[in-house]
Amino acid sequence: DNLLDVILECVAEWGELLRIFVNPPYSNPLPFVQRAAELKKAGHIVVMLLPADKTTEWYTIIQQHANEVIDIIGYHDEKGTWRTGRIQFINPVTGKPAQGNNKGSMIVVFDPFIEGIVTRQMPLDKIKELGGYEK
């Protein structure tokens, strides 16, 4: 058994529902999206950060099982300069933002307590604000 399955079995015995955040490898999110759909069916909430690519096989799973898709979009900063909605990942060794992210991102929510699916757009600065990100 893999560790996640063991943890889920223990949680199921306790009757606790999980709230899970997943940032899978952008190169192959399919198995992670499939697992998120399974976890939703088991009663758990899964929130994922994914590449904004709606032309993929894994996006069809999102259409069938997710409840919310939030496209992360650009914005004008306080000086009026345009900022893309692309998320810069922090290098764990240097602590500095990695360069070269050429794709946008989206947040996908799998929630067993909500029916249907909605798509929204939210500027990256608002997401940072809501998340407590400090400049």
Feature locations, PLM:
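Class I S-adenosyl-L-methionine-dependent methyltransferase catalytic core
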Residues: 1-135
